[in-house]
Amino acid sequence: MEVREWLKLHRKSKKPLLNLSQAAPMSPPPSNLLKYLSEQYLLTENHLYGDVLGDIPLREEIVNLWNEEYSSSICINNVAITSGCNQAFCAAISTIASAGDSILVPVPWYFNHEMWLAIQGINIIPIPCDINMLPDIETAKKLIDKKTKAIVMVTPNNPTGVEYPSKLVKNISNLARDKNLKLIIDETYKNFGNKQSNILYEGKW
């Protein structure tokens, strides 16, 4: 919010301003979406508890979408709806790690990931990156020990925006498989970049 106020004071700058602040929405939702939501708000059934894992029609649609996009063969039992990727990360971490365990995360990382791991008492082990902001796979191998439970990737990366090459994603996937680690991939921004030809699209994940 403070950055936005600062921008208002410099609207007439002679040079273009590059806004590299938090990717928070600054425009209102489309009017047709607001109209639809207001109509749904008046329906009694929308104020009752639903399926814990999410509405079945929505999960079925996601199954169809992912099976087509990723050449996979998942079913509705493999899909759970969460309140955004933050909750999905929290749920995933809670099922695979406990206080005192470790999770490998490339730097720089998404700040909410660090906060949740800290709250849970889980150690975050930084994987250093090269000059192109890509994680060093050889260093990652040396960081794994008996307390390591998973490797986390965000691609395109938040906050750098770097898309991890398919070869790198595959190498990290193989490392996780070889070391019997879970692999958590956050693709929040995947539709903002190029379609990546990586393991996710090979039907092997």
List where the protein language model places each region:
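Residue-level signal for alpha-helix termini/capping positions
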Residues: R11-K12, L42, A97, I144-D145, ...
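Short acidic capping loops at alpha-helix termini that bridge into adjacent secondary structure
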Residues: S73-V79, G100-S102, K147
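Active-site pre-lysine segment of PLP-dependent enzymes
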Residues: A118, I125, L134-A150, P159-W205
